[in-house]
Amino acid sequence: MGKKIISLAMFLALFLLFLNDPAAPQVYRYKDKNGVVHFTDTPPDDKFTRVQNERFRSTQFPYYGNNLLIEMASNRLELVSQAVVGVKTNSTRGTAFLINPLGHAITNYHVIAEAGGDIQAVTFDGQEWNAWVISTDPDKDLALIQIGGGKYPYLPLGKLTDASIGKEVYIVGNPLGLSHSMSRGIVSSVRKGMNKNTPLTLIQTDAAINAGNSGGPLITPEGLVLGVVTFKAGTPNLPVQGIGFAVSSEDIISGLSLTPAKESPGPNSSKQ
């Protein structure tokens, strides 16, 4: 065991050294005028890069806040991560995602149910903000919270028709405290049911779900939210892999009031 720990430590040290080495090789991906994708260690010319950046920033994904983060984001999925926040209470850890620039975010009810008014949200840039509950739907395990601070990046909600069987999907969250981690899978099934006489639609996926993912978004490659990650199947005596569920985006819309006109009153301070 000791040798394994030492080997892992050496690997991580070398990996971090490589990341911080200015001489480490860079790989660029670009598309030529014929639509052919190329990979090269030589950066494309400035004119091409400028056009590509303008096209990328004109996509439907809305963004507000630190422009530096826009420059750092290399693809749409990285931008998606910037609209995901960690949620901390006295007793739980989970995830939430922003749905408008005012700081309104969706999470699971069970993540904030016992918070007692003490909720902290950790944004992509590492800042910690006070947050408070706006509305809840316990039967659908949903909650709308308000995060203090300025304008935020946010995610658009998709439709249930976007959740076709076999479609590639991603989960962004804070599994085991590893902030803004992403896992990948497919839509395995779409299941309709009832919870305490409340209609509920669950999207089944084989993307990895672990403690801390609760409340995070299940998203398409285009950055549309298909659902809110809620739970994974399993029992203490029967380990189960690759069966997780997210409450559908349609349940988000029907279960919570998502159109507050103004910023809600409450604490508005960073606890960086």
For the regions a language model picked out, list residue spans one by one.
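Short, cationic interaction patches enriched in Lys/Arg with P/S/T/G and frequent prolines
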Residues: G2-I6, F18-L69
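Short, flexible surface segments
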Residues: N34, T95, P101, I165, ...
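Conserved active-site neighborhood of the chymotrypsin/trypsin-like protease fold
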Residues: S81-G173, G177-H180, P199, K262-P265
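A short acidic/small-residue loop/turn micro-motif
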Residues: P43-K47, A113-E114, T136, A233-G234
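Active-site region of chymotrypsin-like
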Residues: V80-S91, Q146-P156, S181-P260, G266
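Bacterial N-terminal signal peptides
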Residues: A9-L17
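N-terminal activation segment of mature serine protease catalytic domains
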Residues: K31-V36, R55-L98, G255-Q272
